[in-house]
């Protein structure tokens, strides 16, 4: 059965719960993560929901605000560590608009060890998406779109669950 699993709220400044991320679980038990919230609390949220980081291979980052982006650094770190230990099969693809690729890469280079950042472009793929572009993610056709926010360049997506 497909599930939409909400891991956090839509509020950036929460203190008693986690913020801004969710996951789609398909009928085969595979995951598509949307944003990662604002820090390492993403790891706790995944643990609470019994979602192994090693089973997440597709992630979409909507924009660069801290409550969406900073948890992504932790995801890259933990996925990279799992790759290094031989406990992560395949690649992790992080979809985001083209302006976020360098932002994400730079933050990782400034905060993570080289053996993790060396995986970016190899096993951790930063995949830029354009307005109107379609990708096959899990068994879903996903269409990305620019939401025209005045706060920051932000993308969303459309898909149809089975």
Model-derived segments and their meaning:
Residues 1-162:
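Binuclear metal-dependent hydrolase catalytic cores
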